[in-house]
Amino acid sequence: MKFWEKIAGETIGAEIAEAAIVLPLMFTLLLGIYWFGRAYNIYATITHAAREGARAATASTCATCGNTALIESQVATRVAQALQASKLDPAQVTPLLPNPVLKDCQTGAAVIPACASSPAICFASNVRLNDPSTGPAACGVSVSFQYPYQFYLPFTSLNGQLIQLKADVQTTGED
């Protein structure tokens, strides 16, 4: 009986020590869930903004109605509006050249996208979106950019780590 009393007597305060170990790990896990969720939300938002820019660029043009194809600054304005609607700063956008290299729809020559200055998106129109050996060429537009995101996770190597979330959207033209 004295043996059990000795063991029970030495465990006083063990709960406090266990809590001191477990609570920081649990809080780090909860913060990680929050910050990774925020990163995913920003990724979805910038992809949506790139889609909005591509959708605006592929809208049908009509000579008699007065609308014309958009240029890169107009596409950049559409992207900026979508970013601002989601409370993201368009000034933080940096250009991203698409990979693999885009090819012209008619000639197959490499196309270097035009990059607007504010926000800094890269835009190319009349580019080939598929491999011509797989069927008829699908032509459309490409909109790409990247947005910075910084993690705040204490006790990890990710604390203060800055990553670039990439948005690269290709859309076929409307008829």
Protein language model annotation of sequence segments:
Residues 6-9, 134, 162:
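Generic structural signal for beta-strand residues in well-ordered domains
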